[in-house]
Amino acid sequence: MLNTLLRPASLLYGAVVARRNTRFDTGLGVVKTGLPVVSIGNLTVGGTGKTPCVQWAARALIAAGHRPAIALRGYGSRPGQPSDEALEHRGALKGVPVLASPDRVASIETIRSEHPTCDVVILDDGFQHRRVAREVDVLLVDGRRVLDSERLLPSGRLREPLVSMARATDVVVTHSEHVADRDAMNAAIISLHGRPPVAWCTHKWEALHVHSAQGVTRVPLEHLRGLKLVTRFGIAHPKGPRDQAMAAGAVVVADIPAADHAPFGQAEVQAIESAARDADAVLVTGKDWVKLARVVDLNKFGVDIIVPDLSLVFTEGEDRLLERMLHAVSLEQT
């Protein structure tokens, strides 16, 4: 019922998006920043796996001899504080400059002036940020979703129409283990993009980071077996990590619901502490941990806080995607 009421608003939103895209399609307002740009984004609100994909791209570029920087918008940040994604990237990619600002052109100018050795920029969530010219435009498609069921905001989750997929240089299917009909997904992407996906990937917990008053230790997934957990996932799809924890043998005794990017208030921290009295540990995502670490005193918390080490695992096409990315970057640098 609500979706039906919101459809007129979706039509208006679609008209605004179409007008904006038409302007950028002509090249008006597009800025060449002087550095090769690799954009990684999606068509929908909510998580499709951009953070692990951005980190994969950064590591792959470093391994190939490049010196990347990351520019992102910085959703959910408070004035004077870095965003969840910025903190997560900085923690995972030591030495990689990470700049958060709604003005990505200004961020890249700062990168060029303050980090002159950087030779490529990764735009985190850059598909709709069309003001920045890019050599590679990777679009992530969530394998957990059925493409033809998606609607435009606000009645649905689409930031722009599915036909916008055509402007991507490469499409990558994430969470591909959830694709019920691979042939149908492949055909749908070909019809919208003109080519099949360049790669398919899943998201896997490689290990766990256990935070306690004594510090942080890295342990294998087997550590979860038999543990009673309180979970709190401030992400778009909390069912995924909860299911992974239970698949690893953990028992979820309490779940604290939270919206995507939600900060931790003192009342919520107290609620988690209270629930954890009947648990062995609290499980949160990396995005949650960078916020929780600001407000929790591990010396008084009582139980460990566990953060999964999430990685991107390609089931097909990693070499193709990397080759295309490196080729485009090298052409721009010559």
Q: What are the language-model segments listed below?
A:
Residues 1-36, 328-332:
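A transmembrane-helix-recognition feature enriched in membrane-embedded lipid enzymes
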Residues 12, 51, 89, 124, ...:
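Residue-level signal for inorganic ion chemistry
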Residues 21-77, 178:
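Walker A (P-loop) phosphate-binding motif
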Residues 40, 99, 141, 201, ...:
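Hydrophobic residues at beta-strand termini and immediately following loops
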Residues 66, 72-193, 200:
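Phosphate/Mg2+-binding loops and adjacent switch elements
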Residues 146-279:
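C-terminal accessory "lid"/substrate-recognition subdomains
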Residues 204-208, 258-263, 301-332:
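Short, flexible loop segments at boundaries between secondary-structure elements
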Residues 280-287:
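Acidic beta-strand-to-loop metal/phosphate-binding motif
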